[in-house]
Amino acid sequence: MNLNLYDADLNRIAIIGEQYISCLWSEGYNTIENFTMELVATDEYKKKIRSDCYVGRNDRKTLMVIKTVEIANGKIVASGKQAGRVLDDVSFVGTIESGSMIDTSIKKAYNNGNKYRNLEFADTNLQIPYNHQISNKSILKLCETMCQSEDVGFRVIRNNGTMYTEFYRPEHNPNLVLSENFGNLSIDSVSISTEKSKNYAIVLGEGEGENRKKVYVDSTNGEERRDLIVDANDIQKEENETDESYNSRLIARGIEKLLENQQTFSCAFTPYAKDFGVKYDLGDILTVYLTDYGITLQSRVSRFTQKSQNNKIETTIEVGQITIKR
């Protein structure tokens, strides 16, 4: 894992290479994951490694942004997140209407606001709608909420002196099959939980008692109904606002809360080291045979974590929303 250090203007200011004690690099398909780098506290690094600098790799287009730097006992520990973290510092005040295309509507929201330095949105044409109304969020929250709802990925990449946010959704490749029996992965953990699972939101808006405004968000999809009460009294109907518009805002709150209370089926596994980043990558759909559990699953690679230390890299892959075929 060869690293480079960039300043806030994306000028390369140091070639770190593999001259670090350890590095943890994690990326999510439509989430923002963590980064940590530990180095010997040389005079050069103490001078150059600062918060809001960026770290890149020779083998990936993505970046990490440093948010915290600690110096102690002759070492520097720089930690941060994927570069998409900076989108949390850009606000959107307004409304994206139901049916708007995810990529173009978020790009428009960003371009009409206070742009982040050296960050643009790439031109994409996914033609994937977000079928709910959403208002008044950070640009990062727009990306996370809309993309997670519709299985779309987003990432910030570097292209010379500019960063670009791009949206993507790889199609299913039937040739991407992994199994312990094939020798191309080992299962680290499997977890299935309905502890916090809810699929039917009862959203309570303005008013009191029997006059309390109610809307319903049904995500049961044929499953047993699991109710979630959502107190949305903070969302008040505005002057001259239509019932349809107000209901849409309440429904959007219900969708957000249901996303926070889903059934979890997670599977973490370690792939054959040379396959990841070559045969498949973040966002690709894998077919995984879990022979010990009698399960075949299909899911996107939702997150990967790579730990580099002593010239060895350990890669762990995690998958997200899963289609189970028993």
Q: What annotation goes with each model-predicted range?
A:
Residues E18-Y45, L185-R326:
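An acidic/polar, Gly/Ser/Thr-rich interaction patch typically located in mid-to-C-terminal regions
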Residues K48-V55, S179-F182, G283:
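Glycine-centered loop/turn motifs
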Residues E70-V77, Q82-L87, A122-K198, I202:
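Short beta-strand-centered interaction patches in the first periplasmic/extracellular domains
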Residues L10-I13, R60, Y293:
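Residue-level signal for glycine
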Residues L24-E33, T68-I76, V156-G161, S308-N311:
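Short, ordered beta-strand-loop transition motifs
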Residues T42-E120:
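Surface-exposed cap/loop segments at beta↔alpha junctions
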Residues G28, M37, G80, V93-E120, ...:
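Amphipathic, non-transmembrane alpha-helical segments in extracytoplasmic/periplasmic proteins
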Residues M1-G17:
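Polar/acidic, low-complexity leader/linker segments enriched in S/T/G and N/D
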